[in-house]
Amino acid sequence: MNNKNKIYIAGCGGMLGEAFYSVFEKDYDLKCTDIDVNEKWLSSLDFRDYDKYKKDVQEFQPNYLIHLGAHTDLEYCETNQKDAYTTNTLAVENAVYIANELDIPIVYISTAGIFDGRKDTYDDWDQPNPLGHYARSKYAGEVFVEKKCYQHLICRAGWMMGGGPLKDKKFIQKIMSQIKNGKKELFVVNDKLGTPTYTHDFARNVKLLIEKKFWGLYNMVCSGITGRYEVTLELIKVLGKENEIKITPVQSDYWKKEYFAQRPNSERLLNRKLDLRGLNIMRDWRVCLEEYIENYYQGYLG
């Protein structure tokens, strides 16, 4: 007889979903869905369709609902605002309605990008001030979850890394792709500060909070405060290519045609609540970066 608790994970086909499946699947009975069915453990669902989303969750009768999916490309959100708010805000509201009807907790993933970057660091109690439509749509989802769902877990991530070449659409894969394509000089911004977040550490810390039943809002990033430039230097070091590739620091304006969406100068989060509860198991970003490259990029560069 299967006595495992059941978790429904919506939007599970990306870099974060891959980590959540890996971390949770041994101890829980999972149903993982996505609009892009790219794994054998995924089934098809567009969570923007409220009726189908509700029916699918109700039929599974989970103990928890984890809503992962979102549009995270800032430029896409600026130029496709209707889709950005439909996906990042209204679908989250739908998830709250579903969780409340079933009387189960909801887990929502927010972002360090909801702050305006005027401060150097932000803890769990600092007031967000989102700059662009991606940040606004994500923060609107966060506010709704916090106000409308009694048992909620909101976890704010930083610069995500995870999933490897097929699923990582973020900074690490973009740098790795340039290296794979033979670039010998990389132009990297040195005026954007933040905190990397390894998907597997993030999923493990979410699992810990669920099992401890400490609901609420938590910053959840790797330790070690850094910036894009420093992350690239460390990546080149991990790859052993310090003598092969030149890293040239540039200002954000250098990339303004490709990356025109407004971004905060600092997205550095402090895991103050996790620290106070003694539940911060997020490791140093350098340790995680080395593990990530070793586990996901063997043979990638030839």
What is the predicted function of each stretch?
Residues D284-G302:
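Amphipathic terminal alpha-helices
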Residues N5-D27:
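N-terminal Rossmann NAD(P)H-binding glycine-rich loop of SDR-like oxidoreductase domains
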Residues N205, K212-Y259, Y300-L301:
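Mid/C-terminal beta-alpha module of Rossmann-like enzyme folds, strongest
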Residues F47-T87:
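NAD(P)H-binding glycine-rich loop region in Rossmannoid oxidoreductase-like domains
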Residues I35-D49:
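Rossmann-fold cofactor-recognition segment
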Residues T79-V107:
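NAD(P)-cofactor binding segment of oxidoreductase domains
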Residues V143-G194, H200-L208:
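NAD(P)-dependent short-chain dehydrogenase/reductase
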